[in-house]
Amino acid sequence: MIKEVYKVGGNPFVWNHNPQIMRELLKECNEEQIKLWAESDLALMRKMDAYIGIWGGSNNAENSSVRRENNQIYEKFYSNPVHMHERVKNTKWVILNYPTPSMAQQASMSSDEFEDFYFKVCNLDYSKMSKAMDNLVELMDKTDKVKIIGDGTDLTFSIKNIKAIKCAGEMNIPDGEVFTAPIRESVNGILSYNAPSLYNDGFTYENIKFEFKDGKIIKATANDTKRINEILDTDEGARYIGEFSLGVNPYITKPMKDILFDEKIMGSFHFTPGSCYDEAPNGNKSIIHWDLVCIQTENYGGGEIYFDDILIRKNGIFVVDSLKCLNPENY
């Protein structure tokens, strides 16, 4: 990677974060320390034109021994200013995960099988996907009311006048989603997520269920109800939704506890507690942005999505003629 940057006339700068070292730093960290660290890295980030993030590790639960309070200090005083506020907004960036045996294990695949899967999902024809997404973007931009029905789910909200954004291989790799945000106080009903979620505290949350009233999560349960409510009590915005997105990558069909993959699952949607994106703003601010996924294909219980009372997707398959180009058989 360094050689390639030099070849095109760039000046590479390298941050090499070892997960074990990061864990030890965070276990006893304090606010003053993290602010100073962020100040240094933020100064460098402001000088950068582009950012390439390559993630990988051998243990996805490395941070499980870090106290929640310390993780929150890191998120608030390092991740938010350096990445969410500077890197995301002001650099040309891309993030991907390097395929490792640990990732293969998460996906319940052999290393060889996962390697083939990895390059297939990452290297699909993004130009074709981008063109196919245009009709969905246009429809979402015209939509007011969204209704989602499924196993343990009966949810309504509005996306009126909040822009829809297509993601087709320009930033996250793999890619394949179209996102917007609900009007902050418009969300009402019940939502049951059926994909496990590995949070940055190293714990895997399962069987997550939220009850919403006027946008706020008023009840939350999971395999560790106390723990998930502690996350949602991080700040006021953590109990409101910052993103609604439809996953359309035809080669990703099951969760593997890696959000770069899981949020793109064909026939899924994610409904994200926490901060919104500037591209699709609904005014919600939080130090968290937690993509939680619900899969609506037949193998995962099915479900229906309606835009302004018109059925647009059933059991993970688009049923409106203008959107059928996004279905798996067209790739």
Question: Would you name each region that the model predicts?
Answer:
Residues 57-59, 100, 162, 196-199, ...:
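Short, glycine-/Ser/Thr-/acidic-enriched flexible segments
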Residues 139-145, 204-206, 297-304:
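A short, compositionally biased
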Residues 148, 211, 305:
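Short aromatic-centered micro-motifs
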Residues 184-230:
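Long, well-ordered mid-to-C-terminal structural blocks that present hydrophobic/aromatic surfaces
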Residues 188, 205-207, 214, 239-243, ...:
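Active-site lining segments that contact anionic ligands and/or coordinate catalytic metals
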Residues 219-285:
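Dual-mode signal for accessory low-complexity, basic/Gly-rich regions
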